[in-house]
A protein has these predicted regions:
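A conserved beta-strand-to-alpha-helix junction within the catalytic ATP-binding
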Residues: 65-80
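Short helix-loop "hinge" at the ATP-lid/N-box region of the Bergerat-fold HATPase_c
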Residues: 122-123
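Conserved micro-motifs of the catalytic ATP-binding
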Residues: 59-64, 103-106
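Short conserved segment of the HATPase_c
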Residues: 149-161
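Conserved catalytic submotifs in the C-terminal HATPase_c
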Residues: 67, 92-102, 137
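Short alpha-helical segment of the dimerization/phosphotransfer core of two-component systems
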Residues: 39-44
Length: 207
């Protein structure tokens, strides 16, 4: 958190000087340079903010407590939280959740965050479909067609700061946070990409 704080101060100064320069009468090519500098400063600002959030999440995870909880309800709540986003993107998820109660040793807030990050990623890269399955052995599989991905990109989805498309306003921390949280809970998260379908599998700690 100290690093991200130390980066914020000079960034604020850069923005201040940029705003002053943009108010001056400048040749057109200088204006283009200033716009380019502002864009890169904005990207660095976002990276700093996400780094700050990442360090907060990871530090909180150090004191994480695990409980035996029902996965059905946690998954249903996570899907409900993304209902408006899915609807806005014209995605109607295919959901399969057993009637029987599936339990696992997890931290509810952490697992909710993991699922939220996966769903957010799915919305970004989905071709319009989404399949969510909770199996009886406690695995949660979230899959969708993602023709914009490659196998190499899929393998790097959990890398910190890696983003598939640099044009997207994201530094790629969402899934790396999900991986860190799953490891803290003694579970796993994996990605499999075959025939243009990306599947994220979350496996919680068994009882």
């Amino acid at each position: 958190t100290n690093i991200s704080h130390d980066l914020r101060t000079p960034l604020t100064a850069i923005y201040g000087y940029l705003n002053l320069l943009k108010k001056e009468e400048c040749p057109e090519h200088i204006k283009r340079y200033l716009d380019a500098i502002e864009n890169r400063a904005q990207a660095l600002k976002q990276l700093t903010e996400e780094l700050f959030r990442y360090t907060i999440v990871i530090s909180e995870a150090e004191e994480m407590t695990l409980q035996v909880l029902t996965l059905n309800g946690i998954l249903e709540s996570s899907i409900s939280a993304y209902y408006s986003v899915l609807k806005q993107n014209h995605i109607v998820p295919e959901i399969s959740i057993p009637d029987q109660q599936i339990t696992g040793r997890v931290n509810e807030n952490a697992l909710s965050r993991v699922l939220g990050n996966i769903l957010s990623n799915a919305v970004k890269y989905s071709d319009g479909d989404l399949k969510i399955v909770l199996s009886e052995d406690g695995e949660i599989r979230i899959s969708n067609h993602a023709s914009g991905l490659s196998e190499v990109q899929a393998e790097r989805l959990f890398d910190r700061f890696y983003t598939v498309n640099t044009a997207r306003k994201s530094t790629g921390l969402g899934l790396s946070i999900a991986k860190a949280l799953m490891e803290k809970m003694g579970g796993t998260i994996t990605a499999d990409y075959r025939e243009n379908v990306l599947e994220i599998c979350v496996s919680v700690q068994k009882l």
